[in-house]
Structure formats: C-alpha cells, structure tokens
C-alpha cells in the first residue's frame, strides 16, 4: 500500500511545473510611432461621426413598410386611421410629461405604434384597438429606456382613454407587437441624432410635436432632426449647423424632399410660436381627442381584441 502511495506521489511530482508562476510570454513590441500618433488623434468628434453614420445606415430598417403612409390612408379613404394616429401619438406625448418619462421613450413608442399600424393597415381600426396598441407600445418602450418602469395601470390615461385594459391584455398586446416588429425595438428615431450637449428645448419640442402629424412619417429620421436643428439654431456659428451636412444623405434624399421637410417643420415652428400651449408636454385635450366609449359587454370586447389583434380565441372567456 505504501509503494502505491509513493508511486502516486512521484507521479504528482512529475506533473509539477517548476517555474516562476509570474513568468509569461513577453509582451509584444510597441507599435511604430506613426500608429501611436494616429491612435492618439481619435477625438470625440470622430466617435460621434461613426455613430452618426451608423444611425443613418440603419434608420430605414425601422421605417414604415409603406413609405408614404399618410398618402396611402388618404387614397384609401382611411381618415379614421389617420385621425386615430394623431390621438394615440398625443397620448404618448402626454404620458411622457405626466409620468416624467425620457423623450427617447416617447419617440420609440411612437415608432412602434407607426410601424405596427402600417403593417396592419388592412384592418378596420377602431378607437379601442388603437388604445390597447398604444399602451402596449409605451410599455415596451419603458422597459427598453426607463430605469423605473411605471405600472401598467399608470400607463393608461383614464382621463383621455375610453377603456381600461387588464394587465393580461396589455401583456398579450406586447407579445403581438414583438412578433410583428420582429423584436427590433432599439430603433433609430429623430431623437437619436440630437447632440446631447447642444440640443435646445425648442428642438426637442419641435420633434415631439411632429409626432402628432402623420405627414412627417415619409421623411427619414435624420432629415427630421436636421430640419428641427436648423430652425432652433440662431446663428450659422451655432454647433448644430456643423451637423446638418452630416445628417442630410445626398444619395437617399432629394433636394425636393429636403426643402419640403424643412418647410413643413418651419410651419410647425411658426404654429408653436403663435400657440405656445401646444408645445407643452401637458396638452389640453380637444373634443376630437375625447374617445367615445365602446359600449358592449366585456366578453364581446375581449373576443374582439382576440380576433382582431391576437389572432386567437383563447382570451374570449375573460373580460377586460
């Protein structure tokens, strides 16, 4: 037995590597001075340029499938959908001010809403359908951007919405949205292009106000940001002017599109100047924003949601 122990001990010694544990492969030689100088010249502006180019390349991946969605609605006499888009966007904007959400949350939620509505533009949309979709979009955006996520009850604006939805209904809506949007939630919006240090309140308010008008949906996010930055820059020496040429993509945006977007944003800016209350994050609800309640019993409403939006009858037995 002792011989076996000695043999085992000797084998262990054979496996022992008698060398300094701190010895390692010698470090590689330093790069040539030219490379060190090039690496040292990388500035925050260069990093911003790379981020800007990345956003410009990706922005159309998060655009609507129907480029001129507003024109499509008008041509097909879908004025109710066009009207409900503005109402839903106004709710998102108001929720941002009421709950203290980040502006990025409102822009992302509006992007989810517009993409989902354009994908399902063949549906006959009703007020309650747009309501539950908008709440689902806002809930997903909060989970992506917010540190403190509001409850599903708080996300519903009882003073403006005609319905109050159960948490299970909103969670089902979230799954439907994720599938329809192919889980692409980290989207590129006009807010993505705004510089953190030089962005003014006017720029942010202009872009938030543009969410209410579906006519702006046909323009690239970078072009919308460039138009808002131009109007909020008081002098040609303003730092925002340096961004404009980088935001406008000459190969994908014609001069006509650039001028049209700028003129529309300018008209919006003038309207906000004449009516300062409209640019507030706490808009007053006009009669057009008051949704008429959908008067049916809970089972019919629940089955209608299931049939129209979820494509399943499994929710039929429960009420909203």
Curated annotation (Swiss-Prot):
Pfam families: Cyclin_C (PF02984), Cyclin_N (PF00134). Gene3D superfamilies: Cyclin-like (1.10.472.10). GO terms for cellular component: cyclin-dependent protein kinase holoenzyme complex; cytoplasm; nucleus. Residues 1-46 are annotated as: Disordered. Keywords: Cell cycle, Cell division, Cyclin. The keyword Cell division applies. Residues 24-34 have a biased composition (Pro residues). One of its GO terms (biological process) is G1/S transition of mitotic cell cycle. GO terms for molecular function: cyclin-dependent protein serine/threonine kinase regulator activity. Residues 35-44 have a biased composition (Low complexity). Belongs to the cyclin family. Cyclin D subfamily. This is Putative cyclin-D7-1. It comes from Oryza sativa subsp. japonica (Rice).
